[in-house]
Design a protein with these regions (language model features):
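A short, proline-enriched helix->beta-strand linker immediately N-terminal to the Walker B motif
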Residues: 128-132
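ABC ATPase C-loop
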Residues: 102, 121, 126-127
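Conserved ABC ATPase signature
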Residues: 109-113, 117
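Helix-to-loop junction immediately C-terminal to a conserved catalytic motif
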Residues: 25
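Catalytic Walker B motif of ABC-type/P-loop ATPase nucleotide-binding domains
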Residues: 134-137
Length: 282
């Protein structure tokens, strides 16, 4: 992975995703081969310690780890344990809470927050340690639509700030927004590349065989093409799908404008005349 890149890891339960994350974080040593993160190898205890200082790991349901009386105290826990000066701890706490949009909540009890806010507060505690690599294990699992939208916005903001991100996800829509996608099946990589490459027609059989689908916008586009619509390209996000459909909508409007006068109540496009009276008396 390149610095500042976002990589999505997808696969069915039991495919090896969480094990791969633990290897990346230095929580486990590889049985064979090497794992190198930010210049340190995880083959030795010293190397794994070095990796753990560079990697922030947000496990599933991190909000369950909240414990302090205030959000500020909870987010400060990690930086304080690093032995940083109080002023630096305060700076990091404020910066992390601003990143997740909870700057106004730092004096609140974390248990007064909504479910989505609790997760953001827990993530802020990891961000306050300023990791070079942020590892997210199913960050949107269990959240309502608003919470998922906020989390996706946070990931986009972190990428804009140059944070390198690895996220495990079951959401093909989240994977489609990454720079790089790795597909695992039974602890083996079966596809690896950009979202466009991984979700190409050539890989459709592989994905189906391991129980994975396509991002919904791309799936809709291919269904429309198979039904006779013009080629729509490979829209991976809802925004790209809307852009691809725009010209078709314009063509439909133009065809309507070139047809019969809309004031004419006669048949149009071969459809039968309506049997509904134009006016109904009181």
């Amino acid at each position: 992975m390149r610095e500042g890149e976002c990589c999505a890891i997808v696969g069915q339960t039991g495919s090896g995703k969480s094990t791969l994350l633990r290897l990346l974080c230095g929580l486990e040593a590889p049985d064979a081969g090497t794992v190198e993160v930010t210049g340190a190898t995880t083959a030795t205890k010293r190397g794994r310690r070095a990796v753990r200082h560079q990697v922030g790991y947000v496990m599933q349901h991190p909000e369950r780890q909240l414990f302090a009386q205030t959000v500020e105290q909870d987010v400060a826990f990690g930086p304080r344990n690093m032995g940083l000066p109080a002023a630096e701890v305060a700076r990091r706490v404020d910066h992390a809470l601003d990143l997740v949009g909870l700057g106004a909540k730092k004096g609140f009890s974390p248990f007064e927050l909504s479910g989505g806010q609790k997760r953001l507060a827990a993530i802020a505690g990891v961000l306050a340690m300023e990791p070079r690599l942020l590892v997210l294990d199913e960050p949107t699992a269990g959240l309502d639509p608003r919470g998922r939208t906020r989390l996706r916005g946070l990931v986009a903001d972190l990428r804009a700030h140059g944070v390198t991100i690895v996220q495990v996800t079951h959401s093909m829509e989240d994977a489609a927004r990454a720079d790089h996608v790795v597909v695992l099946d039974q602890s083996r990589v079966i596809a690896d590349g950009t979202p466009t490459e991984v979700f190409s027609r050539a890989n459709a059989g592989k994905l189906h065989a391991c129980g994975l689908g396509l991002p919904r916008p791309l799936s809709y586009a291919r269904e429309l093409e198979d039904a006779g619509a013009p080629a729509l390209g490979d829209p991976l996000t809802i925004e790209e799908l809307a852009a691809a459909l725009g010209p078709l909508a314009g063509a439909g409007d133009a065809a309507s404008a070139a047809g019969d006068d809309p004031r004419d109540d006669g048949p149009r496009n071969g459809s039968p005349r309506s049997n509904v009276p134009e006016e109904v008396g009181a």
